[in-house]
Swiss-Prot record:
Zn(2+) binds at residues 95, 97, 110, 113. The gene is yabA. GO terms for cellular component: nucleoid. Homotetramer. Interacts with both DnaA and DnaN, acting as a bridge between these two proteins. Residues 52-72 are annotated as: Disordered. This is Replication initiation control protein YabA. The keyword Cytoplasm applies. Pfam families: YabA (PF06156). Its main location: cytoplasm. Involved in control of chromosome replication initiation. Inhibits the cooperative binding of DnaA to the oriC region, thus negatively regulating initiation of chromosome replication. Inhibits the ability of DnaA-ATP to form a helix on DNA; does not disassemble preformed DnaA-DNA helices. Decreases the residence time of DnaA on the chromosome at its binding sites (oriC, replication forks and promoter-binding sites). Tethers DnaA to the replication machinery via the DNA polymerase beta sliding clamp subunit (dnaN). GO terms for biological process: DNA replication.
Amino acid sequence: MDKREIFVKMASIEERIGDLYKEIGELKDVIVVLMEENAQLLVENQHLRNRLDRKKTGSQAKQKGTSPVAKEKAKKAVVGEGYDNLARLYAEGFHICNVHFGSLRKEGDCLFCLSFLSGGPQK
């Protein structure tokens, strides 16, 4: 092989590597979109389950005649559970702040999310 052939092959390899790099970037973007959609669906699924549980609990409470104190404790338990779910989502790498809610955290910790988490569940 002469120098020209080697140079042409290197240029060809460089071009293929560039194309592969572009394709990897596109696949990465698709994965980010799918992960965000998955997180949104997980949150929606959890909300629907909570709603179903409340509906079941409400119909059982009507039958049993639950006291107001028990109803207040149930409300506080739901709030604590929601906070735990948001903390779990943040730990999995998603924003829980009102600025970027549900999107994937790409650059480490988010101050808005951390300020929300540091406030803890409101009593």
